[in-house]
Amino acid sequence: MKRLYIVSTGAGGLGYISPEAINAINESEVIVSYSKYARELGSLIKGKELFTSGMTHEIARCAQAIEYARQGKTTAILSNGDVNVYGMATLIVELMDEKDLWDEIELISLPGVTSFLAAASKAGAPVSQDFAIVSLSDRLTDINLIDKSIKFALDCEFVL
């Protein structure tokens, strides 16, 4: 079966990337990435077929990764932090659903160290109580939903 990895590269550079993510990158023929992440991981992706694009082209990158996989090329789409937390996983799953590709492509999502947890660790601020992570980006989320999420989290006294 054709394979598409959604690879978390951690909170930046090579310091937070998991061995499992490195193995997936090594196994992949094609790497799809935001240009900045590709530069940060240069030595790891050297010699691979590479598709990069700039900020705000997330949907196009996801569509291209799926297309490479459909062509039979083992593909890894990279995202910093954890792909499942404000990462590329949601977009990939939505596109896979839209095109009903679940019987055609094996999708493997690899978790990583979120930027939130890396920052908390560096600050010496362990997260030991209930907490909420609310993205303030209105790029793919309506600002009214962001406002509502913040209000509900504060009503519950979550650490934000």
Where are these regions (language model features)?
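Class I S-adenosyl-L-methionine
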Residues: 1-110
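Class I SAM-dependent methyltransferase SAM-binding "motif I" and its flanking Rossmann-like core
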Residues: 13, 87-158
